[in-house]
């Protein structure tokens, strides 16, 4: 399971011109799910994301987590995080989990976050979305539950 985690001032997702999810200060998470992912990957990534110390304290040091600041989180599915561009010029998405199986893991991830964070918004799985991200910093972290980077 992979995530692009961005510290944001605000973020929102639109589908067909309608806002379906929005947050204030917190994290925008683009989430990719692979064929190898299990509930252990959900647990690992959830703990890592909500406890990442990427918010500034009173001394402007990155010492506070999403939980520490009581921030919001928006989670957007993005299978393209498993795009393999090593051969040719068109990405291969063969490692990405698709369909119903990915949808189930995506929802389990969201539910695990909701147990820890008060304001959780999401995109729409499988939809063509417009994602608006007002970065703060910018601070962007790449995470992989298999620890490949």
Swiss-Prot record:
One annotated GO molecular function: Ser(Gly)-tRNA(Ala) hydrolase activity
Described function: An aminoacyl-tRNA editing enzyme that deacylates mischarged D-aminoacyl-tRNAs. Also deacylates mischarged glycyl-tRNA(Ala), protecting cells against glycine mischarging by AlaRS. Acts via tRNA-based rather than protein-based catalysis; rejects L-amino acids rather than detecting D-amino acids in the active site. By recycling D-aminoacyl-tRNA to D-amino acids and free tRNA molecules, this enzyme counteracts the toxicity associated with the formation of D-aminoacyl-tRNA entities in vivo and helps enforce protein L-homochirality.
Domain-related comment: A Gly-cisPro motif from one monomer fits into the active site of the other monomer to allow specific chiral rejection of L-amino acids.
Family (UniProt): Belongs to the DTD family.
The UniProt record lists the keyword tRNA-binding: yes
PANTHER family: D-AMINOACYL-TRNA DEACYLASE 1, D-TYROSYL-TRNA TYR DEACYLASE
Quaternary structure, from the entry: Homodimer.
Catalytic activity: glycyl-tRNA(Ala) + H2O = tRNA(Ala) + glycine + H(+); a D-aminoacyl-tRNA + H2O = a tRNA + a D-alpha-amino acid + H(+)
Gene name linked to the record: dtd
Gene3D superfamilies, alphabetized: D-tyrosyl-tRNA(Tyr) deacylase
Alphabetical UniProt keywords: Cytoplasm, Hydrolase, RNA-binding, tRNA-binding
Domain of life: Bacteria
EC numbers, comma separated: 3.1.1.96
Subcellular location: Cytoplasm
GO cellular component, one term: cytoplasm
Ranges spanned by the short sequence motif Gly-cisPro motif, important for rejection of L-amino acids, renumbered to the chain: 137-138
Species in which this protein is naturally found: Clostridium botulinum (strain Loch Maree / Type A3)
Gene Ontology biological process: D-amino acid catabolic process
Protein name per Swiss-Prot or TrEMBL: D-aminoacyl-tRNA deacylase
Catalytic EC class: hydrolase
Lineage: Bacteria, Bacillati, Bacillota, Clostridia, Eubacteriales
